[in-house]
Amino acid sequence: MVRYADDFVILCKTEEQAKAALEAVRAWVAEAGLSLHPAKTRVADARREPFEFLGYRFDKGRRWPRDKSKRKLRETLKPHLKRTGGQSVQAVIGRINPTLRGWFGYFKHAEAAAMREIDGWVRMRLRSLLRKRRGRRGRGRGDDHHRWRDAFFANLGLFSLEQARDLACQSMKMAH
């Protein structure tokens, strides 16, 4: 047995089953001379109470990346998306794509809306960078969406989380 079990979730159909499972885990852990952390151990109805686990937020049967996970991704990408970086947009895209692919690899089971939100933020930062190159201030919004459409960034090779998720979902449907 491992010295400690950091995080795990047990899903049951009824509250009685959940309580029985909790007691079984308590006994199993006690046999090893360990104990469950009281503040982190609970029986909850996942249909009514959202819970967070391993970077995801589970809410009403849906999976979302935790706000903390999205914030960390933005913090990782920001240094590459600075308006004063002096690199071509293609070079910037080349630097951020591996991070986006890795993040998608872990969060590919999250809701499409979460992917759309991150994609939009990345494109807004890239539009802002392009505005700066034209001697303009501000964020990449409004008319910039017409000037530099999403397809513009796709043609430059920007990895789209939403498109990757759509493809992954299609592949899963085809397999069944």
Could you describe each region identified by the protein language model?
Residues M1-H176:
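Non-catalytic terminal/accessory segments
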